[in-house]
Amino acid sequence: MSCVAELVFFSGTMDCGKSTLALQMDHNHGARGRVGLIFTKMDRAGTNVLSSRLGLSTGALEVGDDLDFWDAIVGRATAGTRIDYLICDEAQFYTSDQVEQLARIVDEMDVDVFAFGITADFRTELFPGSKRLIELADRVQVLQVEALCWCGRRATTNARVMDGVMVVEGEQVVVGDTQPGTTGLVEYEVLCRRHYMRRMTSHAAKAAALSPEVLPFDLDVCPLPPLPITQAD
């Protein structure tokens, strides 16, 4: 473990294990006698909780837009609370000012900050928090657990889906269900770039496969065999 505190941003799409890694890192550091605080914002399981899709969860401090990380951590340290590291989940939702406060905590208080978040929104535009983390972090680590598109390719984008139809307009932050097929709700689905650009969700792919008016496969994935060349007499 480095003797110099770092600001590290662990990034990836949905389903790549960010929150699971956050929980594991807290466990590992705690097992070595280090003391930390866990922060999160708008976790799908509710407020004041950090949860993963594997069913693991733990209590956390909820981050509001008005939270000043610097004041909060300095206040605890002044009161005698030992703090060696911070776990900051759903960091894409933090404000740019809050990310700058986290960087200051690393530099001036020698406290490690491990931030976890999605890089880009459903429009493939950077979240403000993620953008500032990329700009300021000592290290940016793309998680190696690959989320998969419905076609089996590596997923690189987060699509917003309403009633099976992918949308590319609307508020940047809308918390929704993450299990495809929940009608009447906003949901999210990870897609490869090709199917994001085509707006081809798993729901749309199934509909296309059942339609007699379209070929039931992707010609780019399963190209038709070339026509035989006939010799002139």
Name each model-derived stretch.
Residues 145-181:
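Short recognition patches in nucleic-acid-associated and regulatory proteins
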Residues 137:
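Short basic (Lys/Arg) and small-residue
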